[in-house]
Regions:
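Juxtamembrane/transmembrane-helix boundary motifs in multi-pass membrane proteins
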Residues: 4, 41, 69-77, 81, ...
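Membrane-embedded catalytic cores of phosphoryl/pyrophosphoryl-handling enzymes
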Residues: 110-198
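Residue-level signature of transmembrane alpha-helical entry/exit and packing/kink sites
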Residues: 56, 77-82, 149-152, 174
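Sec-dependent signal peptide recognition
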Residues: 4-12
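N-terminal transmembrane-helix/juxtamembrane module of multi-pass inner/ER membrane proteins
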Residues: 7, 16, 20-63, 67, ...
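Transmembrane helix-loop junctions in multipass membrane proteins, especially transporters and channels
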Residues: 68-75, 101-106, 168-172, 193-198
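Hydrophobic, lipid-facing residues on alpha-helical transmembrane segments of integral membrane proteins
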Residues: 83-95, 99, 175, 179, ...
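Lipid-exposed faces of alpha-helical membrane segments in multi-pass integral membrane proteins
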Residues: 55-65, 88, 92, 151-158, ...
Length: 198
């Protein structure tokens, strides 16, 4: 993947955010109100959200450990690519969160958005979503089989939905998070090819 495509993705994400500011509280808050119920059974959606960080940690560790035990250098190297995508994703997500500093929807609309819990960091982009899509995309790049790709992206998409259902994020936070995660995985793949080409 060319670096030009990565810059283009970043510009699209920024454009989405600033376009959203221009249209402010219209379609986005209406959609979020439809997704986020005032009285809900949060358990399933909460568990989906909570699955992100344990899976993100366990996946590359398991890949590396199995690769080490089986003396499988390829699998070990694939675990590095996953870690790379997660590190890039975390860096970009946090940089965007603190530079844009978007208010959480439940702070801006306390009478119409009902959060499961209140997060302390900024809203844009969704960190859970970006991390889920970084992992899903990285795994899909490594294992291009439908039985890997479909469950990975289904899980990542359900994480994004859960963040809105729980009242934690606007739809554009989730879309931007998905874009950042996908871009991070492809950037990690590209960097690995450049750094480790024989």
């Amino acid at each position: 993947m060319k670096i030009k495509n990565i810059y283009r993705s970043i510009l699209i994400i920024a454009g989405c955010f600033f376009l959203n500011i221009a249209n402010a509280q219209n379609w986005e808050i209406d959609l979020l109100k439809d997704i986020n119920p005032s009285q809900a059974h949060y358990a399933f959606q909460q568990n989906i959200s909570k699955s992100v960080y344990p899976l993100t940690l366990a996946t590359p560790i398991t890949m590396f450990t199995v690769g080490l035990i089986n003396k499988d250098k390829k699998l070990q190297h694939q675990s590095y690519k996953v870690v790379g995508s997660l590190l890039i994703n975390t860096t970009v997500t946090l940089a965007m969160k603190y530079s844009i500093n978007r208010q959480r929807p439940y702070d801006k609309y306390p009478t119409i958005i009902f959060p499961y819990t209140k997060e302390k960091d900024a809203s844009f982009p969704s960190g859970h979503t970006s991390t889920a899509f970084a992992l899903a995309t990285s795994m899909s790049i490594q294992y291009k089989k439908w039985y890997v790709v479909v469950p990975c992206y289904a899980w990542a998409a359900s994480v994004g939905y859960s963040r809105m259902y729980l009242g934690e994020h606007y739809p554009t936070d989730v879309l931007a998070g998905a874009a950042v995660g996908i871009g991070s995985a492809y950037l990690s793949e590209w960097l690995n090819k450049k750094l480790f080409k024989k």
